[in-house]
C-alpha cells in the first residue's frame, strides 16, 4: 500500500547503541505476522552518531548478536550477484574488523577503540543497501523474526553459516576472499576448501561469542519450519542470492540442519 504524507517534516537524528542497522535504515511494522516496511526520504536520519562510550551499557547478548548481524550484512553484500567495487571494499573491511574486534569487546568491555571499530564496521556493511542486495540468510531471518519473534541478530547467528555452506558451490571464489578477511590461511588451499574454511571460521566465531547456534535455542520448533520455508521462498527475487533456490524444500533442508 502506498501513500503520501502531508505532515510537516521533522529532522531525525539517531544514536545507535548496538551494531544492527535500525539506527540508519529500518522502519518496520511487526505488529502482525511477517514484516511490513515503510520507506520515504524523510524517514532517513539526517545525523547518525556513533559513540562507543554509549555502548558500554548495551547488554552483551545484544551487542554480540547484532555484531553478527552486521557480519551477515557484509558477507551477503559481498557475494550477492549485485555486488559493486565500492561495496566490495567496504564489506571486506567490515568482515575483517568484526571478526578481529568483536571478541575483544566481549573480553575487554572497556576497550572503546575496539567498540568504535565494530561500530564503523557495522556502518560499512550498510553501504549500497539498495544496490548490493542481501540474500537467503536475510530472507530467512525476516520470516524467523516476523513469525517467531526471533531478534534479527540471533537469526543471523543461527542461519548465516548454513546459508554460506549452501551458497559455496556458486560463490566459492567470493567465500575464499571472505575467509582471508576473517583470518583463514588460504595458501595451499583450493578455492573450494578455502570457502569451506570461511564457513567454519564464521561458525566458530559465533559460538565463541556465546551466541545461539541452533533454532531450538531461540524458540523455533520443527512445526514452524514448513511455513517459514514457503514464506522465505516467496520473498526471494532473482539476483538476491548467488545460488538459485529452486523450491521451498531447499530452504527447508537448511532450516532442518539449523534446528
Task: Give the ranges of each region predicted by the language model.
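Structural motif
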Residues: 26, 47-48, 69, 126, ...
